[in-house]
């Protein structure tokens, strides 16, 4: 069920060229966020690959001293780049709205879950930056505690987005138009990501093995699946924008706001 909207008067229609340019920029912002966040986390701050959960407090402090500058600069850079994720989320939701022909349940869930998404990057880095800021003055045990909180909130937080993936996949399957907004295989990519993210909920119980925060099921498979999703989704959004523009031109449809 969705809220049906009547076409607005011509004077309230949005300039279509502006809308499509904005959506294309928003789709590309998904690539930018992934590239910058991945580069910062893997190469600058070196929080990925994750530390061994069984590292001693002294080992954690030594690691943090060695990577202090990278951790703090990662937070600075991400503060400028991660907000672009909202553009990506909004455009994804807009295209889902085409499927439901209004602000339906699936679209609204996508919007709300998408609002939470940047917090999954920001909040953990704030915690780690607070630890690294005065790293020389902190006891190893405090630094170990804050590192635990970082990985719990970063790796474990990903499980929350299972619902977002399910909603996007479901919307893709219910699209019965001749030329669907998203191809059918994209639904299964989303369902796969939802399944792969689920083991992240178990990291609080394990310090080693595939379900630890550096394990195969809790980190590496979700990381790979997320990369596939984050590459395919912007590409499909660009195609969806093209189809929307063509559809509007053929039918001379106003853009609903």
What are these regions (language model features)?
Residues 2-257:
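Hydrophobic, aromatic-enriched alpha-helical segments typical of multi-pass transmembrane helices
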